[in-house]
Amino acid sequence: MAYSPSLNDIKSILNKYTSKDYELKCENRYDGKLELWLKGVFEEIVKTPGTRYVTHKQLDEKLKNFVTKTEFKEFQTVVMESFAVQNQNIDAQGEQIKELQVEQKAQGKTLQLILEALQGINKRLDNLESK
């Protein structure tokens, strides 16, 4: 036997999926089935949350704002070229830093030698003063 919803079931379904802007009429038929009438504007009766139809003209207008594949490829090459230039700059700066570190080490060794020489002179002066 097929499922036959009651009038309350039908009303609860209509309340769930439709707005309140309609007139509902329901009668029992001679064969025991329900006859149901809805009177109202279809778009106002049926709720369509999130459902929106777009015409081709509207779609074309929207698509004008999107980037084409060739434009995207051009943009991508420009970005990749700028990344390559930045990478070269970073490599050059890294080499400069290495050179400066080597120079700094050499200066540190020179300063150490100067310090040792000054300490040697200081010891000699102390020896001369003590005599």
From Swiss-Prot:
It comes from Mycoplasma pneumoniae (strain ATCC 29342 / M129 / Subtype 1). This is UPF0134 protein MPN_010. Pfam families: DUF16 (PF01519). InterPro entries: DUF16. Belongs to the UPF0134 family.
